[in-house]
């Protein structure tokens, strides 16, 4: 949790680690980001890296996935910008469906 973002576990995890990083300020989704939102996006990325670091996934022999879902075809059901942080196992074939 920072001044601009919060992070919490997804209620329907698609991987052993599945955390959502959410800005406190409302933005509908990633398609609505503007140049003025650069600091918000940067803070979200830094928070996502912190989540991965805390989970031990940021090392050279590990990895994690960051995902923005936009619109109904991407199965986005949350009308607020959020970044999925996934990891904890090889992610071949993992897709976010909610």
Predicted regions mapped to residue ranges:
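HIT superfamily nucleotide-processing domains
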Residues: 1-98
């Amino acid at each position: 949790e920072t001044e601009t973002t919060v992070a919490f576990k997804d209620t329907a995890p698609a991987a052993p680690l599945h955390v959502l990083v959410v800005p406190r300020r409302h933005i509908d989704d990633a398609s609505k980001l503007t140049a003025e939102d650069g600091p918000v996006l940067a803070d979200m990325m830094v928070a996502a890296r912190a989540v991965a670091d805390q989970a031990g996934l940021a090392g050279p022999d590990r990895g994690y996935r960051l995902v923005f879902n936009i619109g109904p075809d991407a199965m986005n059901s949350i009308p607020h910008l959020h970044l999925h942080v996934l990891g904890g196992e090889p992610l071949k074939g993992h897709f976010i469906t909610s």
